[in-house]
Amino acid sequence: IEKQMQQELQTWMNRYLPFAMLSTRYYLKTLNLPPNEIRATSGLGMPEKYASLFGIQANACISYDPPCPAIHVITCADNGRLNPDLSICQKFADEHGLQFCGDMLGLGIVNLHFSETFDRYYHLWIPVRPTA
């Protein structure tokens, strides 16, 4: 990342960090792959109510994901397993006539054990639609 972008990001984090949390976008095209092949990008996520309060708008560095039907699940990750196993979510979707239809978003809700290893619990949103 270029220096100016790093400074802008640091300023943004300093201003909004109490309202934002670690966020990961897992790309739809990789969600049905084994966990070690799922591709993702991490950053900071903020609930819409806070983004609206601060007048934050989508731009080249900030994306907005509108509300949509989704499977919600809490899962855990650690040093050796950063990507979730979505097989149980896929099974649920299949049993209820649903299919994944968008990038999955994960918001970190708690971190434990900050020594050599860690456990991090995530709230995952997997956008779904009825199977055609």
Where do the language-model regions lie?
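A solvent-exposed interaction/effector surface
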Residues: 1-132
